[in-house]
Amino acid sequence: MEGLDEKKPWGKLSRLLGAETDSSSELFLYKKEWTIGRKKACDLSFPGNKLVSGEHCKITVNEESGEVSLEDTSTNGTVINKLKVIRKQTYPLKNGDVIYVVYRKNEPEQNVAYLYKSLNQGQDSLHDPADTSGSEEAETQTLSSQDDQLSYEEPQPSTSTSSLFSTPTTSAIPGVQLESAEKSGESLGGHSSTSDASPAIRASIPKSNLSTQEQGSLGPPKKRIRTEDHWTTNKNFVPASCPIGASDESKTPSMKPDKMEETLTCIICQELLHDCVSLQPCMHTFCAACYSGWMERSSLCPTCRCPVERICKNHILNNLVEAYLIQHPEKCRSEEDRCSMDARNKITQDMLQPKVRRSFSDEEGSSEDLLELSDVDSESSDISQPYTVCRQCPGFVRHSMQPPPYPPPSDTETSRTQGDAPSTSTNFPTATQEYVCPSHGSHVICTCCFQPMPDRRAEREHNSHVAPQQCTICLEPFCHMYWGCNRMGCFGCLAPFCELNLGDKCLDGVLNNNNYESDILKNYLASRGLTWKDMLNESLAAVQRGVFMLPDYRINGTTVLCYFCGLRNFRILTYQYRQNIPASELPVTVTSRPNCYWGRNCRTQVKAHHAMKFNHICEQTRFKN
């Protein structure tokens, strides 16, 4: 075949709107390669659709043979005739194929579908199924060249799209509807059993042709099993029996899912929830295994794109799923599927949302952060996530955006401002720098900067030279004493209580959020040239003497605390420090105020007028049990 004339179109894409094509949105294909995506540079662009990848797919034509193929380059996947195209692989396009750029089974209004029409006479003749004695063209889901002569009042794809079109009746015109030709048995090469047909044709036959008891069922097709994936790339392979047909016919006829099933369906895997987790604050729910893969590449909710703060188990929904499966045991996942999901589950307890590094997207809000919403598991996709690695793992590659290792070079010490980098020191930099993580070693995520570090907490119990990695009170992990936290604005998220840097604003509202009483304390310290650090050291000394009390008897000046636990205990000590200031050392305007009935427990003391009128550095006297 001679080279194609660029001015003469070799194909056409018509937008599908329900059962009709939109003639106003027909696109003629001239170029050798036609790209589809969200980028504005694509030939067919969807700039406002977040479900479309930047470069979603591309349609190419072989100028010599005239063959047209589609290559998927997306994250969410491209669907042709409701069969998933494996990423980075090509799929031959034939006259009448329906291309789903966006396919949502439970949200058909969001579907973006196009009908491909070949305008190349050579390609039509190449796929002409004139031979009805078992020709290869009939087995590979081809259409008649008579399509060129038909009107497009009601175009039909080459495979069954019963959820999109509403005309299941047979047609006397071959080429408009492949199902009609197949029902007569001629295009299947004389085979009377659908189980002897190729998987591509098997997928194209509607439910009404598979079983006489299932006529009239127009529900969406059941989810294909994964063994179908390699059939789409080997169209000449015809198995002795089709397991898909056997699987579908052994179950109840396809029906629309009931409201309860829709409510209990995970939008990522499109199956009933398994080990359900909820995201906070939006409270959307997903399978724990599904969201485990998602959270490694995006910190946004898959449903509403709201930033996720916490991940929690949803026990109520888990109980509802169990009750639903008791009534519908046929919808239960297989044992192999459940074991696979349990192995991929990384959410074993309530946890904070880990921080995700987004460095490979060239557009804000790129859908490359979206999870693979398909039937293809992670082992068959090239976007599977590696094991968690930190800067001490062997083979770790430091990105240009990676912060410098702790401790930083000495020439930068003088240029730091308070809060721009860790402000406290550690006694274990040498041992930390020499450590190398074992292969696939355990890691823990810092609560402050959300960066991974080696989990050596158990090792520290036997080796005091290993730096502390968690708070003594809340047991949350922090990396500051291990190798220095690099989060901007961190004052030192983990340190001994006496070395904690609480910041200059730690005295604001320090006394039960009572700004008036807090200002009295600040003025008292300023008049004597004292700082909050001096007050903390005096209070810790009073704790040692037994004068001041803390709620946890383990806390002293050397106890390793995080910033939040340290600030909370600092406020407790500050109240006792203010309570022990002699009245003679305070202004008369302060000591002349009567005590509030509610004392330190007063909920009105945050109001300036009430705080100025009454003293709240006292105990409650009214209604005290």
Curated annotation (Swiss-Prot):
Q: Which reaction does it catalyse?
A: S-ubiquitinyl-[E2 ubiquitin-conjugating enzyme]-L-cysteine + [acceptor protein]-L-lysine = [E2 ubiquitin-conjugating enzyme]-L-cysteine + N(6)-ubiquitinyl-[acceptor protein]-L-lysine
Domain FHA: residue ranges: 34-85
Descriptive protein name: E3 ubiquitin-protein ligase CHFR
Q: Where are the zinc fingers (PBZ-type)?
A: 594-616
**Which gene produces this protein?**
chfr
> Where do Acidic residues bias regions lie?
362-380
Low complexity compositional bias: what residue ranges?
Answer: 158-171
- PROSITE patterns (UniProt xref): FHA_DOMAIN, ZF_RING_1, ZF_RING_2
- Molecular function terms from GO: nucleotide binding; ubiquitin-protein transferase activity; zinc ion binding
Q: Name the predominant localization.
A: nucleus
